[in-house]
Amino acid sequence: MTELETFISSNSKCTFDTSQLPADADYEWIVTESNLPYVPLYIPAQWPMICGEAQRATYYEHRDNNSNGWSSVCIHGISQSHTDHYEVYTEYRDLSSRNVPYNWTDIDAPYTKFWLQEYFPYDVYHRVRFMKVKPGGYILPHTDGNQYSLNAVNIGIWNPNGCKLVVKDRGTVPFNHTGSVFLFANNFEHAVFNDSEQDRYHMIIHGYPDDYRISERFRKLVVEGYRSLLPRIH
């Protein structure tokens, strides 16, 4: 078996122990100490409209050193094609994250931009990207940081049957076929395999609410998502 096949087969059916989760956990504990791989966020959207905009976009190859068939385009960022972390780019690597020239790009995605500005509970955006994985495409096992934190938003816009995001020792993230939002701890080793005949479209959001102050709306969404996991173990 290949590295990817071994990782998927060994971890896709794992479950994580939630038997000791406190029912009264607050936002700070959930995102920094719970050790959960993900928490669902229940945020409505016109998912077919977002999916249509994602499908029509022009994509740029992304991290081809550890993937195949993975591409991306920025909705908000330095430009449409600057899909990686700003420190990868020589001209920006010495800047602080606050000084990177992030802005809405000229991608033709009017509804997605409207939804992000009017409905998603962030006030400041860094990179916001459509991500595509072609049929048979994959992202090899990797981590995005060493410190635990639920800090990346991963949205399944179109997640065809047979496409999995698998987390080491914690199983498969339960994306709906279309339209589901998760706060994701990307410090855990994880991998993607699109074992389907359709393109897989996701959106990944990096940003924060209220200029580093966590809004009550966002706190409530995270706590509600966390509590939705509790019935699984009671």
What are the roles of these predicted feature ranges?
Residues 1-119:
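Non-heme Fe(II)/2-oxoglutarate
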Residues 11, 62, 76, 82-85, ...:
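Histidine (H) residue identity feature
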Residues 40, 74, 129-132, 181-183, ...:
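Ordered hydrophobic segments in well-structured contexts
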Residues 59, 79, 137-139, 185:
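A subset of signal/propeptide-processing and intrinsically disordered low-complexity segments
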Residues 67, 124, 149, 197-199:
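A short, structural micro-pattern
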Residues 112-183:
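Catalytic core of non-heme Fe(II) oxygenases with the double-stranded beta-helix
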Residues 159-234:
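Catalytic core of Fe(II)/2-oxoglutarate
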